Amino acid sequence: MSSSCSGLTRVLVAVATALVSSSSPCPQAWGPPGVQYGQPGRPVMLCCPGVSAGTPVSWFRDGDSRLLQGPDSGLGHRLVLAQVDSPDEGTYVCQTLDGVSGGMVTLKLGFPPARPEVSCQAVDYENFSCTWSPGQVSGLPTRYLTSYRKKTLPGAESQRESPSTGPWPCPQDPLEASRCVVHGAEFWSEYRINVTEVNPLGASTCLLDVRLQSILRPDPPQGLRVESVPGYPRRLHASWTYPASWRRQPHFLLKFRLQYRPAQHPAWSTVEPIGLEEVITDAVAGLPHAVRVSARDFLDAGTWSAWSPEAWGTPSTGPLQDEIPDWSQGHGQQLEAVVAQEDSPAPARPSLQPDPRPLDHRDPLEQVAVLASLGIFSCLGLAVGALALGLWLRLRRSGKDGPQKPGLLAPMIPVEKLPGIPNLQRTPENFS
């Protein structure tokens, strides 16, 4: 029975040796020296690091004197484990025939990489970044190779590998793991991102096609401030600035949306202001309000940004105090201050004093459209009037210069038939 078991063991070892030898020789160095890697449930080949290839050695587990594989196995300096599992992890020692230790090998088990999950985002119109995460936890040291290239139009095979289309390396961020950044991208172009995960047991690649206008997502607006408007217990004035990562250009602007709610109210009210400020006119008097803003490309490219941190403000509770200046004292100083303020080139700061005129929240574009429509209708009316006047003058001039044509403004009743008009018909009496 023991001989049959030993024979079966020899057969399994021979099969495992054939499988491992056909797949790969001794594994190349990866990570710390003296460490080799394997996958659970698969055969593993360990190589004695201190001897030349083909030298017969004996193998032991570290701290265990039992022989695992003798020098007469015919495997030389290699140790073949038919099917490894977690108990097989650890350190193995190899010795030559003279008893000298050849070296130590540490076996670690893990899994080959799966396809990584990749996503890309652009915070402005000329740079974008891509992040990734492993498809599965391999338990082994892992590296990532990242590159990108510009996609060509269908049929442009000659440009597929030209220097103008790449591929180029996607520089990985040294401060943030699993992230690479592409600078100087073209807003209307399409790019292919290549992220390859590599570990000692293999490699796996993910290819992702991206368009800058589709992945555009600005950073949240900055500097949000909420202030009360004196004398108006239901108004709040909110202002903010562009995110620092967005370069302001006339053809690449942002639009904004603003949300606000009173304290202890879960529902948000949303408005889309024009510009970098908004006056809330329906605030709840006496209650603090939370306000937040987000941004998006003004042509709706990409998606809305994340919300900015909330800012709080409470409407004014006191009545408006009209201060009457004392002109009997310091009249000259006040007049000089007013003149100096009018002559100053610095832009006037917005006043927080209430404006008695009603607020006009109409869109300036809407006002321009109305004015343009009125102008077009006025021009059309003038053109029609001028055409009618010219036609009337022409008909009048032609009637004076020659006889009227029958059928064209000619009288329907003969002149001699009209009452009170003498008969002008030629007779002998008329000539006598």
Swiss-Prot record:
Free-text function comment from the UniProt entry: Receptor for interleukin-11. The receptor systems for IL6, LIF, OSM, CNTF, IL11 and CT1 can utilize IL6ST for initiating signal transmission. The IL11/IL11RA/IL6ST complex may be involved in the control of proliferation and/or differentiation of skeletogenic progenitor or other mesenchymal cells. Essential for the normal development of craniofacial bones and teeth.
Entry comment on modification after translation: A short soluble form is also released from the membrane by proteolysis. The sIL11RA is formed either by limited proteolysis of membrane-bound receptors, a process referred to as ectodomain shedding, or directly secreted from the cells after alternative mRNA splicing. mIL11RA is cleaved by the proteases ADAM10, ELANE and PRTN3.
A molecular function GO annotation: interleukin-11 receptor activity
Tissue specificity comment: Widely expressed in all adult tissues and in embryos. Highest levels in kidney, skeletal muscle and embryo.
Residue ranges of domain Ig-like C2-type in the record: 27-110
Region called Disordered, residue ranges: 151-170, 309-332, 342-361
UniProt domain Fibronectin type-III: residue ranges: 112-219, 220-317
Disulfide bonds listed in the record: 48-94, 120-130, 170-180
Gene: Il11ra1
Subunit text: On IL11 binding, forms a multimer complex with IL6ST/gp130.
Claim: Cytoplasm is one of the keywords in the record: no
Name of the molecule in the record: Interleukin-11 receptor subunit alpha-1
Transmembrane segments: 373-393
Coiled coil: none
Keywords noted in UniProt: Disulfide bond, Glycoprotein, Immunoglobulin domain, Membrane, Receptor, Repeat, Secreted, Signal, Transmembrane, Transmembrane helix
Disruption phenotype: Mice have disturbed cranial growth and suture activity.
Family: Belongs to the type I cytokine receptor family. Type 3 subfamily.
